[in-house]
């Protein structure tokens, strides 16, 4: 008698799983140098097969069985365990990552590079300075901008560096396709000024050599995570820790007065008001508030496009706080406000634009960068774009020991700075560039040393309240003699070695003169260490100069010559963000030097500003429109990928070396000193009997050559033939730009001396349509 055996569905499936196991004997290791089939299992494991060794892959739709048959006759069988099948073309390592631009900046270096076909991400390494070997930078520092990628290495001490870009496919580095660029000169931030005077350590989270302080923490903030980023913060003096979420909420933990661990907040891309978790100050925006402790906090932008739009930054009751390398647009009131009970604070390399138009004297916003209730402060290397009221220094509160240096007052109107009460105020090496109202304003018993600044078409370079140019020497109508500063008492100015051109009026003190011994805008000295006589006092208030700048304990500093200030401030290492930021606007000096109204075109562009950032490689959720990361799916045994795209503009410079690996320059450099497209370039390739540049483009381009006018050459030879195209000279920039010359893919070009010696400063290749 036959017995029947009944099995449950569960038991049956168990037996099937036991007796129908996968049979896998022919899979190979992942190899990016050959075409492969990728079989991904439900478990997440991947089995790889070289397509040249596979004759077929068969799928049974009834049982979900997959069979991989090899050309040698063997087969691997997967019994319902396959999740997906994909095909991966080999990576063409004959074409390495194309670096289109690489430069050192201030305590950082960056590299721009084209997409590498097949790469899902990149690893970037830096070597030099504190890094004896190539050291990987944080993945958050690698971003896509659609037409190109960018990576920034940050926290570098001064020195020469190299960077290496390695494409990554499926979390595996393709080292054969890596590209290295070297000779990237990194300089230190200039730390001269009162912020660092008698400071016990570096201002912010960095030491004075540009490296991070011991134990420093870093958080990265973008629109993708400004509300969700979290960090553990100390909240009482017993060591209690609290996890705070959202960037404003994290910073608010400092109000407990106990958190002092160094922290760097690195801002990536554009942050709008709606992106923030909250804002601690309804009037200003992001509030950085302590309780008088050394906070060791730096807020800095990554690259050239970090921007706060719709809000600014308020710093209150803080010590050792640093703001650097970001832009502020369309803020509610002040752009930056150092306000109340701050010490040793520093704001530098910021781009500050219009605020919200609230009419009247707030049509361009309120203060761009105001300092109130603060001691030991430096405001340096900032770019002010047509600001209405730049730098209020005291609103009647106690402000002292403040330095303003290397700022670019670009068509801004007034308050550069406007000073009350401060007895130790140093203003030097600033570029006053087309200012419609006045430069430095001294009131209420203040003492200001104004040194080695460059004034171009600044209406009144210096004013003292109720005397001199401020009231037309007391002569004229009531309007002429009213004054600028609400009838406040005067402050006194010592001036040394300033350069002025195009001003309406500047009246220096003249001893014994009936008018100019009373009505003067500044006391001008011939020697920096000359002291002002005690009898020199302001007409209203009777304030004399305290000669603070000649005291033995005055801080050490190294000023630039006044004549060099425009080139320094507008140069590559100059004012504003890295690369002068991602927003550019050219002022028409003929109309804007004297205009103090809002420029509607500029205002509209700022309102409409949008970031070109597409993707942060470690944050897939950054954008809804980021490039896909799927693997290519060619036919079995398909062709190799096309050579990598060179669709972006290629720019190469020769400041001591070629900035692009495509170009080989003879080591024959000379000083050209040009300003091209807003960037200052010092050196170029000297085309004499020794100089040459050789390159082979991988696609067709239109080539523009830029020569320095310091040498007579206005043409070159290309492969032995003299160029015949004409060009245009830019006297202000000191360069001669040839009209475009066509170059063809896969052809070697050698550029040498033409009719006369020349200095080739820059080559720009624009892809042909």
Where are these regions (language model features)?
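Ser/Thr/Gly/Pro-rich low-complexity, disordered linker/stalk segments of secreted
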Residues: 24, 29, 75, 623-646
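Extracellular beta-strand/beta-solenoid scaffold signature
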Residues: 279-287, 309-313, 330-339, 359-371, ...
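Surface-exposed, short loops/turns at beta-strand junctions within beta-sandwich domains
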Residues: 152-160, 741-745
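Short beta-strands within extracellular/lumenal beta-sheet-rich domains
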Residues: 678-699, 713, 735-737, 757-760
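Long, contiguous C-terminal flanking segments immediately downstream of a protein's structured core
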Residues: 90-113, 117-121, 125-132, 139-140, ...
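Glycan-recognition and processing domains
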Residues: 640-690
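Right-handed parallel beta-helix
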Residues: 295-305, 319-330, 342-358, 367-368, ...
């Amino acid at each position: 008698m036959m017995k029947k055996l009944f099995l449950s569905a569960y038991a049956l499936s168990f037996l099937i799983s036991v007796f129908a196991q996968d049979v896998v004997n022919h899979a190979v290791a992942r190899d990016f140098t050959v075409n492969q089939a990728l079989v991904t299992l439900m478990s997440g494991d991947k089995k790889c097969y070289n397509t040249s060794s596979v004759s077929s892959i068969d799928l049974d739709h009834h049982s979900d069985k997959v069979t991989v048959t090899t050309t040698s006759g063997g087969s691997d069988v997967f019994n319902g365990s396959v999740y997906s099948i994909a095909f991966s073309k080999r990576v063409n390592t004959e074409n390495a990552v194309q670096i289109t631009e690489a430069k050192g900046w201030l305590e950082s270096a960056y590299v721009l590079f084209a997409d590498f076909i097949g790469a899902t991400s990149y690893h970037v390494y830096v070597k030099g300075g504190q890094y004896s070997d190539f050291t990987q930078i944080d993945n958050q520092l690698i971003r896509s901008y659609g037409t190109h990628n960018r990576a920034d290495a940050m926290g570098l001490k001064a020195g020469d560096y190299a960077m290496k870009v390695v494409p990554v496919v499926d979390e595996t580095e393709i080292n054969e396709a890596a590209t290295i660029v070297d000779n990237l000169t990194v300089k230190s931030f200039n730390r001269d000024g009162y912020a660092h005077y008698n400071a016990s350590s570096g201002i912010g989270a960095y030491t004075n050599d540009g490296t991070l302080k011991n134990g420093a923490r870093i958080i990265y903030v973008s629109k993708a995570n400004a509300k969700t980023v979290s960090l553990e913060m100390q909240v009482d003096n017993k060591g209690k820790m609290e996890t705070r979420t959202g960037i404003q909420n994290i910073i608010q933990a400092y109000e407990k007065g106990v958190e002092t661990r160094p922290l760097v907040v690195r801002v990536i891309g554009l942050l709008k008001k709606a992106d923030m978790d909250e804002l601690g100050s309804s009037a200003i925006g992001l509030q950085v508030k302590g309780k008088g402790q050394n906070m060791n906090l730096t807020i800095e932008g990554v690259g050239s496009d970090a921007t706060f739009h719709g809000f600014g930054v308020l710093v209150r009751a803080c010590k050792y706080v640093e703001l650097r390398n970001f832009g502020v647009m369309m803020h509610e009131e002040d752009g930056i406000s150092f306000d109340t009970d701050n010490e040793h604070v520093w704001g530098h390399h910021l781009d500050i634009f219009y605020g919200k138009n609230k009419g009247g004297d707030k049509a361009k916003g309120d203060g761009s960068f105001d300092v109130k209730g603060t001691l030991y402060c430096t405001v340096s290397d900032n770019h002010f774009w047509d600001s209405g009221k730049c730098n209020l220094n005291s609103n009647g509160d106690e402000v002292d020991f403040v330095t303003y240096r290397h700022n670019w007052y670009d068509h801004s109107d007034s308050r550069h700075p406007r000073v009350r009460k401060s007895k130790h105020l140093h203003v030097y090496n600033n570029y006053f560039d087309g200012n419609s109202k006045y430069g430095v304003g001294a009131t209420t018993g203040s003492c200001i040393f104004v040194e080695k600044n460059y004034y171009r078409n600044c209406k009144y370079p210096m004013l003292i309240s109720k005397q001199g140019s401020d009231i037309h020497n007391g002569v004229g109508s009531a309007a002429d003699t009213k004054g600028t500063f609400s009838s406040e008492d005067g402050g006194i100015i010592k001036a040394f070695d300033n350069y002025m051109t195009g001003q309406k009026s500047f009246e220096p003190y003249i001893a014994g003169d009936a008018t100019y011994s009373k009505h003067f805008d500044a006391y001008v000295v011939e020697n920096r260490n000359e002291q002002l006589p005690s009898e020199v006092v302001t007409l209203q208030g009777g304030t004399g100069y305290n000669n603070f700048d000649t005291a033995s304990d005055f801080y050490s500093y190294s000023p630039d010559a006044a004549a060099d200030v425009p080139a320094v401030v507008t140069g590559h290492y100059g004012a504003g963000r890295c690369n002068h930021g991602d927003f550019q606007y050219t002022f028409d000096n003929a109309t804007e030097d004297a205009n103090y109204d809002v420029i509607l075109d500029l205002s509209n562009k700022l309102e409409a500003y949008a970031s070109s950032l597409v993707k942060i490689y470690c944050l897939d959720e950054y954008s809804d429109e980021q490039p896909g990361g799927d693997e290519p799916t060619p036919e079995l045994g398909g062709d190799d990928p096309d050579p990598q795209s060179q669709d972006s503009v290629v720019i190469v410079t020769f400041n001591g070396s070629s900035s692009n690996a495509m170009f080989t320059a003879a080591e024959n450099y000379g000083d050209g000193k040009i300003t091209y497209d807003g960037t200052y370039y010092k050196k170029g390739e000297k085309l004499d009997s020794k100089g040459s540049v050789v390159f082979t483009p991988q696609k067709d381009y239109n080539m523009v050559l830029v020569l320095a006018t310091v040498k007579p050459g206005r043409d070159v030879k290309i492969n032995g033939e003299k160029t015949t195209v004409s060009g245009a000279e830019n006297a202000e920039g000191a360069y001669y730009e040839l009209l475009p010359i066509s170059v063809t893919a896969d052809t070697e070009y050698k550029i040498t001396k033409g009719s006369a010696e020349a200095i080739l400063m820059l080559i720009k290749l624009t892809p042909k349509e």
